[in-house]
């Protein structure tokens, strides 16, 4: 939320927010000016806004008296009308009593986003509203006043809150809260140690180099494999070699049919990746961060098959057969495909759920 300040001060706040990765701004006064600052989604009670706002200057913020009969709610009727007109709708509700809690639930069944404001969530726990909206297709945004409030709200993320909104007061506050949200959204994968059971040089195939917009450090790479539910940690080209200069932004990922883990615990085929797509960078501890594809390079190269076993499950991947291509061993050291041998211990990720269109589902699918 933009502060009630002169435009020049507000502009600096919004610019800092955009640089910190914040992409939504709620503002009622300077829609046209904000549009010129960058690619940002503006939430406002204007027909031209990216997201149409209901609730401010209405029942949501207490400007209008809320009837006990929610069917008579002006905010609810306005939200329904906006949805019929094809707008993306955000509802704003200050939770001051049980009646406004019910208004939030009703609006949540209509709106695409709902902003919830409360001075004390111990009076009406946020979890109550989340539980009531569990089956609704709405993103729940909790309003916070400061960094401590953001930390508290972020702890609730796992229970159903989709984000936070705050009024910008200073530049450090913006950066700290933005970083909190980024850190909370990171997934950590439980990497296992598998035993190599087969190493087989093959002929040539089309392999993909994923060049990202980030510089990776030693120990970082991507989760890649022939099976969507069992992936090797393939190391980045962040190490120096006597044969070629390092390319810390690159993962020589494997052939076109291989899967790669991307944000949201989804997988994609390497052949699908294009500039601008998101991918996950993973380190030896399973910690992740999001990066963007700057370029995907497909070239004909000799391949090598690597098979490993974990708790009776066979894991396979194909990689380019070159000394500079590495996976990661059990001691978190890069292991060149030129040096891999049967019996080596390597880092893998294995999940029990199958995947449908890259999304994990509880279903039996056999891959071999």
From Swiss-Prot:
Highest taxon of the lineage = Archaea
What InterPro entries does this protein map onto? DHQ_synth
Keywords in alphabetical order, please.
Amino-acid biosynthesis, Aromatic amino acid biosynthesis, NAD, Oxidoreductase
Per its record, the protein catalyses: 2-amino-2,3,7-trideoxy-D-lyxo-hept-6-ulosonate + NAD(+) + H2O = 3-dehydroquinate + NH4(+) + NADH + H(+)
Q: What is its EC number?
A: 1.4.1.24
Molecular function (GO) terms listed?
A: 3-dehydroquinate synthase activity; dehydroquinate synthase activity; NAD binding
Question: What Pfam families does the database record attribute to this sequence?
Answer: DHQS (PF01959)
Q: Which residues cross the membrane?
A: none
Q: Which GO terms describe its biological process?
A: amino acid biosynthetic process; aromatic amino acid family biosynthetic process
The similarity comment for this entry is: Belongs to the archaeal-type DHQ synthase family.
Q: What HAMAP family does this protein map onto?
A: Arch_DHQ_synthase (MF_01244)
In UniProt terms, what function does this protein have? Answer: Catalyzes the oxidative deamination and cyclization of 2-amino-3,7-dideoxy-D-threo-hept-6-ulosonic acid (ADH) to yield 3-dehydroquinate (DHQ), which is fed into the canonical shikimic pathway of aromatic amino acid biosynthesis.
> Which protein, by its recorded name, is this?
3-dehydroquinate synthase
Write the gene name: aroB'
């Amino acid at each position: 939320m933009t502060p009630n300040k002169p435009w020049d001060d507000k502009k600096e706040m919004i610019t800092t927010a955009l640089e910190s990765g914040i992409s939504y701004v709620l503002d009622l006064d300077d829609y046209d000016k904000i549009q010129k600052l960058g690619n940002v989604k503006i939430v406002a009670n204007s027909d031209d806004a990216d997201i149409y706002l209901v609730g401010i200057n209405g029942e949501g913020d207490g400007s209008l008296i809320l009837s006990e009969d929610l069917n008579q709610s002006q905010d609810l009727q306005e939200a329904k009308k906006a949805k019929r007109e094809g707008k993306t709708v955000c509802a704003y509700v200050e939770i001051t009593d049980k009646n406004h809690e019910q208004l939030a639930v009703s609006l949540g069944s209509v709106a695409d986003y709902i902003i919830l404001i409360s001075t004390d969530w111990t009076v009406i726990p946020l979890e109550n509203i989340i539980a009531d909206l569990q089956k609704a297709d709405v993103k729940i945004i909790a309003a916070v006043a400061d960094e401590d409030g953001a930390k508290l709200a972020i702890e609730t993320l796992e229970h159903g809150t989709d984000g936070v909104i705050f009024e910008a007061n200073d530049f450090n506050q913006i950066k700290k809260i933005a970083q909190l949200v980024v850190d909370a959204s990171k997934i950590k994968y439980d990497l296992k140690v598998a035993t190599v059971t087969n190493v087989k040089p093959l002929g040539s195939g089309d392999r993909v180099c994923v060049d990202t917009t980030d510089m990776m450090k030693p120990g970082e790479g991507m989760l890649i494999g022939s099976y969507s539910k069992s992936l090797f940690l393939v190391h980045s080209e962040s190490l120096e070699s006597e044969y070629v200069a390092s390319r810390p932004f690159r993962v020589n990922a494997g052939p076109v049919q291989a899967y790669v883990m991307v944000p949201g615990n989804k997988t994609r085929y390497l052949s699908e990746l294009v500039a601008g797509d998101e991918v996950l960078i993973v380190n030896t501890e399973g910690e992740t961060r999001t990066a963007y594809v700057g370029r995907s390079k497909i070239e004909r190269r000799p391949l090598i098959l690597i098979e490993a076993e974990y708790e009776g499950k066979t894991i396979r991947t194909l990689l380019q057969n070159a000394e500079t291509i590495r996976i990661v061993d059990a001691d978190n050291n890069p292991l060149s495909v030129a040096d891999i041998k049967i019996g080596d211990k390597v880092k893998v990720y294995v999940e029990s759920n199958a995947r449908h269109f890259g999304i994990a589902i509880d279903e039996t699918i056999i891959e071999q």
